[in-house]
Curated annotation (Swiss-Prot):
Pfam families assigned: PI4K_N (PF19274)
Intrachain S-S bonds: none
Highest taxon in the source lineage: Eukaryota
InterPro entries per record: PI4K_N (IPR045495)
Protein name: Putative inactive phosphatidylinositol 4-kinase alpha-like protein P1
Family membership: Belongs to the PI3/PI4-kinase family. Type III PI4K subfamily.
Signal peptide: none
Region (Pleckstrin homology (PH) domain conferring phosphoinositide binding specificity), start-end ranges: 180-262
Length: 262
């Protein structure tokens, strides 16, 4: 309801006067939104979720729906889904931390819902930083609490990368044929120096990567090292070529005693 009615955390931003433009006749004052009710409400939601995630899938679904409706995919713009005033930073990031807790608890079975919620969380976080910085209007105690909330969100966000599983990056089965078609179309349009460079670069790259296949049968240690140096000795450096690991640097030579590119 507060989202639709634009109350508290979701209220429209009031344009504040520039303190540098103040005069004796006009003394500008900050216009922070009233977010104390949302502070209390989100505190309750955080505590309730810690119980619900163990015993009530219905309540978890309500939490998921509430978070989805409270956040937006938009970043920046004249009107944000939440008030960007510095006084609203505490409840905003406490709500976002609750969203990450919901994802980390692995209680939402639908992968699409999880992915959309994660994207909304990040978008809403970035949206706060799309406006110019402002001087805090909170009291000392509340400001310390808000900073602590942001640190907790950062910690939760930093650990969120382990929930981006490899299965999300697996390409579809039919992409192989399309890839070959695109490669043929792109390389077929090359001619002259461009085609010569393409052939030199990928010939050199294929020979370097093939070294791994050559040394794979050898056990780790001196035998594998000798096999590696032996395979590298057969590779001739081509002029103007680079390695994918460092495309901005041109390989001038290879130290065949250590295998280090130079």
């Amino acid at each position: 309801m507060t989202v639709e009615q634009k109350f508290g955390l979701f209220s429209a931003e009031i344009k504040e006067a520039d303190p540098l433009a103040a005069s004796e006749a006009s003394q500008p004052k900050p216009c922070p939104p009233e977010v104390t009710p949302h502070y209390i409400w989100i505190d309750f939601l955080v505590q309730r979720f810690e119980i619900a995630k163990y015993c009530s899938s219905d309540q978890v679904e309500i939490f998921s729906s509430l978070l989805q409706r409270s956040m937006s995919l938009n970043i920046g713009g004249a009107k944000g889904s939440m008030n960007r005033h510095v006084a609203a930073i505490g409840p905003r990031f406490k709500l976002l931390t609750l969203g990450l807790s919901l994802l980390h608890a692995d209680v939402v079975p639908n992968a699409t819902i999880r992915n959309v919620l994660r994207e909304k969380i990040y978008s809403t976080a970035f949206d706060y930083f799309s406006c110019p910085p402002k001087f805090p209007t909170q009291g000392e105690k509340r400001l310390r609490e808000d900073i602590s909330i942001m640190i907790k969100f950062w910690t939760a966000m930093f650990s969120d990368k382990k929930y981006l599983t490899a299965s999300q990056l697996v390409p579809p089965a039919d992409i192989g044929d399309l890839r070959e078609q695109l490669v043929e179309e792109n390389t077929g349009s090359l001619s002259g120096p461009a085609k010569d460079f393409y052939q030199r670069e990928f010939d050199f790259f294929n020979k370097i990567t093939n070294v791994s296949a050559v040394i794979k049968p050898y056990p780790k240690g001196d035998q594998r090292k000798k096999a590696c140096l032996s395979a590298l000795s057969e590779v001739t450096v081509q002029p103007g070529c680079s390695l994918p690991s460092n495309p901005e640097a041109i390989v001038l030579d290879v130290d065949y005693k250590s295998g280090t590119p130079m």
